[in-house]
């Protein structure tokens, strides 16, 4: 009540922000006549002028009005597109390091050019991040014309580029690319043996398109570069054969003499939890598995791995459905993105789940992988000095954006008022009744010529609807993961008269649906059918298509615009809003309605009891529907619960990943300093002194007399580490104390290093230290990541011992990290003293081998955090098992990183 009153008096935060920006818009508008009077050369010359003024100390904020005015005029001349006033506000929001929520069709692609152009003036680079290669290429080519017209360079980072091409594209003023490519390039750079091989040049400013998809939907999906293990895949086939012999049971509550008066009873061999997407063996199931696998105790420590694989196989059979969670294509299990419905070639579920699904489907099983480098999108994007984003749906997740990324959301007003009515949900008892109503609605709109976009949440549901429409004789397009190659063309024509388009989870985001059709897209299809056509014929066809689409546009507007039909509510309100947002662009008419049933996943798992009670109370008969504000509210509450739960999971993940992030920063910073050759000898001597200090502490106890120290072990350790023979008489030992021993060892070791440097020369000595240090860091960092994975797997069990798993994880991860640092230090010192180098060519050959290995990029796989197994994994090609290991150890891959 009080907050509502305050908002009425002083306005909401969003209103106050917009009020602050409108005067700057007026200033930009006042500069428009001045910019229009400039020649093309003079307008281009403004970029060089801005760069000079910036170099002399003028801030980007001070340059903003003029720079935006120049960019707007450049867009008008080169693209035939003039930025609207609300788009200027969007550009200012991005420049301020915030998220601009802009409705579909409001021109987010053009808005990004304002902030990108202004920030490129600094010369530090701007990254524009998109969700797929198609959009990255399209936007870089399209908007690149504007940047080129204004004297800036544009690059694009997509799959398939080599390092030289990537380096050139990152060196451009503005670089477009996908989140995966940017993240993997960062990880690969930090595995290289020369700064000259790095492709990225820093993290200055990023504009993330579809920011909700990248920073929220994919936040639980870490990027991981990994190599295969040498484990046998036979176990998956063996365990897969016993799963069909297990019977699914359920959990029942029965009366009992307990505090609550009830106890849980488990029937069958296993139970499933759909919310957690997990499956658990019952006592009866454990006995049956032990009998089938011929083992005595499934919970014996030696059989824990077998138990894990049984649970994963249960999940594969009971929870993961073909054509819903994955498809089988060309002998491969391909994951379906639960948010977009697209296939994700190369992504793999982690922790043996993908292998379990492969065994279930009878396809070839790929071996599991070991992590070599990893980062989450959350921590990758937080490295940028300034981060901003755009989306049509961010306000529902504003709290998460602020808490995790420190990003505020500004809702940008539409250029024209929104005319789309969103009708209340219609709810049926069964899915069959719901689909019948959906078909009836589609048929009604089709017969009058109004285009419809029908959203489904899975490939399976889209194909069911398609079959029902086919039986009714209604022509339509199906846009799901199986046809993602054509999605842009199909979506572009979804606003044509009588067009019926079924889309899985709004695949095709980033392509506008224009009422009446898109003439450019029609021309593209015509060109494919007429490859011999001349430029004059193409120009004539384009004009014909423009007239045709303009006439059809008016007809479709008169019919009510694009009608949106949702066939199921998603767990997130944001995904539902994305579907609705495809209609009503730029003031066009449109409408939307969702059809639901009590058998839908969201209602069945999270909210059906309350809705079912209301339907029973109102005596709703079969085939009848209910539309009521109470039910809409109940569904929204279920969605809010799921959103809050998912937010907690992502926050939980970042709390854990922050520990690893700090460790990763230390290691990667140290690697870069070594590659840059900064104080390499000094760093090595510090390592040497620390190693000596550790040895003295281990063998020279102050409470014992020097003659009682373990001189045999001490001498062996000193010789092993420093190649120094300790020759001390009893009299000399008797006079020593711990400090004296440490000083003596330091003097001898430093003198030995000096002699070695004199023999090799300072340059070659530093070269040797650098190569040995990098080798030690990379080998032990890889092992550390494996140890951290193992720590994560069991850390949740600490809660049973009344301990906080998060605090235990932080403490033990720190201990593991310090142990790794000591191992790196000792190995570096030992190798520098012992490695045999006779001439410069020896070490150059050693380094060249390492550089060559680093160029063979590893298998890049994105897998989920162990605690969130429902998330997928992404992969690229790796080195062979018998090739030299890319970590630089000199061993074969299968004997080193591939163990």
Curated annotation (Swiss-Prot):
Its cofactor is Zn(2+). May bind 1 zinc ion per subunit. Residues 573-592, 861-899 are annotated as: Disordered. Disulfide bonds: none annotated. Keywords: ATP-binding, Cell inner membrane, Cell membrane, Cytoplasm, Membrane, Metal-binding, Nucleotide-binding, Protein transport, Translocase, Translocation, Transport, Zinc. One of its GO terms (cellular component) is plasma membrane. Its EC number is 7.4.2.8. It is found in: Cell inner membrane; Cytoplasm. SMART domains: SecA_DEAD (SM00957), SecA_PP_bind (SM00958). Zn(2+) binds at residues 885, 887, 896-897. It holds the Pfam family P-loop_SecA. ATP binds at residues 87, 105-109, 512. It catalyses: ATP + H2O + cellular proteinSide 1 = ADP + phosphate + cellular proteinSide 2. It is a peripheral membrane protein. One of its GO terms (biological process) is intracellular protein transmembrane transport. GO terms for molecular function: ATP binding; metal ion binding; protein-exporting ATPase activity. Part of the Sec protein translocase complex. Interacts with the SecYEG preprotein conducting channel. Has a central role in coupling the hydrolysis of ATP to the transfer of proteins into and across the cell membrane, serving as an ATP-driven molecular motor driving the stepwise translocation of polypeptide chains across the membrane. PANTHER family: CHLOROPLAST PROTEIN-TRANSPORTING ATPASE, SECA INNER MEMBRANE COMPONENT OF SEC PROTEIN SECRETION SYSTEM. Belongs to the SecA family. Monomer and homodimer. Part of the essential Sec protein translocation apparatus which comprises SecA, SecYEG and auxiliary proteins SecDF-YajC and YidC. This is Protein translocase subunit SecA. The gene is secA.
């Amino acid at each position: 009540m009080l907050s509502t009153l305050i908002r009425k008096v002083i306005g909401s935060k969003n209103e106050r922000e917009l009020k602050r920006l409108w005067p700057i818009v007026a200033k930009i508008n006042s500069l428009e006549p001045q910019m229009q009077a400039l020649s093309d050369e003079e307008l281009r010359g403004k970029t060089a002028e801005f760069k000079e003024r910036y170099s002399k100390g003028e801030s980007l904020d001070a340059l903003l009005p003029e720079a935006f005015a120049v960019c707007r005029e450049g867009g008008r001349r080169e693209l035939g597109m003039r930025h609207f006033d609300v788009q200027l506000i969007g550009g200012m929001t991005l420049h301020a390091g915030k998220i601009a929520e802009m409705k579909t069709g409001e021109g987010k692609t053009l808005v990004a050019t304002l902030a990108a152009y202004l920030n490129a003036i600094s010369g530090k680079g701007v990254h524009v991040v998109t969700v797929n290669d198609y959009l990255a290429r399209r936007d870089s080519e399209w908007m690149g014309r504007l940047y080129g017209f204004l004297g800036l360079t544009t690059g694009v980072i997509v799959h398939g580029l080599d390092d030289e091409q990537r380096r050139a594209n990152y060196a451009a003023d503005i670089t477009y690319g996908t989140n995966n490519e940017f993240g993997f390039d960062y990880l690969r750079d930090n595995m290289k043996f020369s700064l000259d091989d790095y492709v990225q040049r820093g993290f200055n400013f990023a504009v993330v398109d579809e920011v909700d998809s990248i920073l929220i939907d994919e936040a639980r999906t870490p990027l991981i570069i990994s190599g295969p293990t040498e484990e046998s895949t036979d176990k998956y086939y063996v365990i897969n054969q016993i799963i069909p012999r297990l019977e699914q049971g359920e959990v029942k509550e029965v009366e009992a003499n307990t505090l609550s008066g009830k106890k849980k009873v488990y029937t069958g061999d296993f139970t499933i939890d759909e919310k957690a997407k997990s499956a658990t063996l019952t006592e009866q199931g454990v006995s049956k598995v032990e009998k089938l696998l011929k083992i005595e105790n499934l919970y014996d420590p030696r059989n824990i791995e077998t138990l894990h694989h049984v649970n994963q196989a249960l999940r594969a059979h009971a929870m993961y459905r073909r054509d819903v969670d994955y498809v089988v294509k060309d002998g491969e299990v391909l994951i379906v993105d639960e948010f977009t419905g697209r296939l994700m070639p190369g992504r793999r579920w982690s922790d043996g789940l993908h292998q379990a699904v492969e065994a279930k489907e009878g396809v070839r099983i790929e071996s599991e992988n070991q992590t070599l480098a990893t980062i989450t999108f959350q921590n990758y994007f937080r490295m940028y000095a300034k981060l901003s984003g755009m989306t049509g749906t961010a306000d529902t997740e504003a709290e998460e954006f602020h808490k995790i990324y420190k990003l505020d959301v500004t809702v940008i007003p539409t250029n024209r008022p929104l005319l789309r009515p969103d009708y209340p949900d219609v709810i049926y008892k069964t899915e069959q009744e719901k689909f019948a109503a959906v078909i009836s609605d589609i048929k009604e709109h089709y017969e009058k010529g109004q285009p419809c976009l029908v959203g489904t949440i899975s490939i399976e549901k889209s194909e069911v609807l398609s079959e029902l429409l086919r039986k009714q004789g209604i022509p339509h397009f199906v846009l799901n993961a199986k046809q993602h190659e054509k999605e842009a063309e199909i979506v572009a024509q979804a606003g044509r008269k009588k067009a019926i388009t079924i889309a899985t989870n709004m695949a095709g985001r980033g392509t506008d649906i224009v009422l009446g059709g898109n003439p450019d897209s029609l021309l593209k299809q015509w060109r494919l059918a007429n490859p011999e056509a001349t430029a004059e014929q193409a120009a004539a066809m384009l004009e014909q298509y423009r007239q045709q689409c303009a006439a059809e546009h008016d007809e479709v507007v008169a019919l009510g615009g694009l009608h949106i039909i949702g066939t199921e509510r998603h767990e997130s309100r944001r995904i539902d809003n994305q579907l609705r947002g495809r209609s009503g662009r730029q003031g066009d008419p449109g409408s939307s309605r969702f059809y639901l049933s009590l058998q839908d996943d969201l209602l069945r798992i999270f909210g059906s009891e309350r809705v079912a009670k209301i339907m029973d109370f109102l005596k709703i008969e079969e085939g009848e529907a209910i539309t009521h504000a109470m039910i809409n509210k109940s569904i929204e509450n279920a969605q809010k619960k799921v959103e809050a739960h998912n937010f907690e999971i992502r926050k939980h993940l970042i709390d854990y990943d922050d520990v690893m992030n700090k460790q990763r920063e230390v290691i990667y910073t140290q690697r870069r300093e070594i590659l840059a050759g900064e104080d390499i000898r000094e760093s090595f001597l510090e390592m040497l002194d620390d190693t000596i200090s550790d040895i003295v502490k281990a063998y020279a106890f102050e409470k014992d007399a020097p003659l009682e120290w373990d001189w045999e072990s001490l001498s062996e350790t000193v010789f092993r580490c420093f190649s120094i023979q300790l020759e001390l008489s009893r009299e000399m030992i008797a006079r020593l104390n711990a400090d004296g021993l440490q000083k003596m060892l330091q003097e001898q070791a430093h003198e030995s290093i000096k002699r070695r440097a004199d023999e090799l020369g300072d340059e070659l000595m530093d070269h040797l230290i650098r190569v040995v240090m990098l080798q030690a860091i990379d080998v032990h960092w890889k092992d550390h990541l494996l140890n951290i994975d193992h720590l994560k797997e069991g850390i949740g069990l600490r809660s049973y011992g009344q301990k906080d798993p998060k605090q235990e994880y932080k403490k033990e991860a720190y201990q593991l990290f310090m142990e790794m640092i000591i191992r790196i230090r000792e190995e570096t010192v030992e190798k520098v003293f012992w490695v045999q180098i006779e001439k410069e060519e020896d070490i150059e050959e050693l380094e060249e081998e390492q550089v060559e290995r680093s160029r063979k990029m590893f298998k890049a796989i994105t897998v989920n955090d162990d605690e969130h197994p429902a998330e997928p994994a992404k992969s690229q090609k790796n080195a062979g098992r018998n090739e030299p290991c890319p970590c630089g150890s000199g061993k074969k891959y299968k004997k080193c990183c591939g163990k």
